[in-house]
A protein has these predicted regions:
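Residues on the lipid-exposed face of transmembrane beta-strands in outer-membrane beta-barrel proteins
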Residues: 38-40, 79-83, 134-138, 152-156, ...
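Transmembrane beta-barrel architecture of outer membranes
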Residues: 76, 184-190, 202, 223-231, ...
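Repeated loop/turn-to-beta-strand initiation elements of outer-membrane beta-barrel proteins
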Residues: 88-91, 144-146, 199-203, 239-242
Length: 279
């Protein structure tokens, strides 16, 4: 898996070198047409969820990290691209995948969907969360020192939970496996700012929030999204730089669908280090 990721990253960097080699002008702060970022993200997590069942009723609220032993921290590759459509309008795309797993013997009876796992059951769990934020923003303040923008976008979220247990007391299923899936674009209103300390160094911050109710893929999702971050970048050449960031994100959602009926609360926080390219 990591081999494929790094191969794709190398291909992306090769394309960037080709584009930059044909660029006609040195990019100026706030005037770049494209900015690419690729690096490592090291978040820590706090996740609770509940999966109901039509026959068994309301499921138990479960902490994935504390009760199911799913990894509390993970290192993943994170990439993004910014396209400046015009002087004040820009689009941004971010993508990363969080894939965690764990095995633990539970110390209380837990109902997850159509499964009831008794005390002493050994549960092996896998939780995947893919996040693809797509956002448009407009710079209402823009000069040689500052760029302050606001806009809106979609936080495309794909969530998958799979739990396999060594014992089950469910009266309606002999399967030991419990699953839940959710897939929906969630709206987000965002604002960001960037301050150019000098031509080679800048600092920035961003916030986002929304209270939503959306229907997609045979399900209804409603809840809240909150996000915040801070970053700094240093351009060691006209086209290439390094950066660091800190990101915080929270989503609380109630899901009513054919593949998941229940609740989901998810928080991550962590640093990011990346390489940047611009033209």
């Amino acid at each position: 898996m990591q081999t494929h990721v790094w191969r794709n990253a190398f291909l992306l960097l090769s394309v960037l070198f080709t584009l930059l080699s044909t660029a006609q002008a040195v990019p100026i702060n706030g005037e770049e047409q494209f900015i690419f970022k690729l690096g490592y993200f090291l978040p820590s997590f706090d996740t609770t969820l509940r999966v109901n069942n039509e026959q068994l009723g309301r499921g138990d609220e479960v902490s994935l990290e504390n009760e199911l032993g799913i990894d509390r921290e993970e290192t993943t590759i994170r990439g993004s691209v910014m396209w400046r459509i015009s002087e004040r309008n820009k689009l941004s795309l971010d993508i990363f995948n969080l894939n965690r797993s764990g095995t633990k013997t539970i110390n209380r009876q837990i109902q997850i969907g159509d499964q009831i796992y008794p005390v002493g059951a050994s549960l092996t769990s896998k939780f995947t969360f893919t996040i693809i934020p797509i956002a448009w923003s407009y710079a209402f303040i823009k000069n040689s020192d500052w760029e302050v923008s606001a806009g809106a976008g979609l936080q495309w979220s794909v969530i998958n939970l799979k739990i396999d247990g060594s014992a089950s007391l469910s009266p309606i299923s002999t399967s030991r496996e419990a699953t839940a899936d959710a897939n929906a674009p969630l709206p987000l209103i965002n604002a960001d700012m960037k301050y150019y300390i000098n031509p080679d160094w800048n600092v920035g911050a961003n916030i986002g929030a929304f209270t939503y109710k959306v229907g997609a893929a045979n399900m209804t999702m409603q809840g809240d999204i909150l996000s915040a971050g801070a970053s700094t970048e240093w351009w060691f050449t006209d086209y290439f730089g390094v950066g660091g960031a800190v990101n915080w994100f929270y989503i609380g959602v109630t899901v009513d669908g054919s593949k998941w009926d229940g609740e989901f609360n998810y928080t991550y926080f962590g640093p990011q280090a990346y390489l940047s390219a611009r033209f």
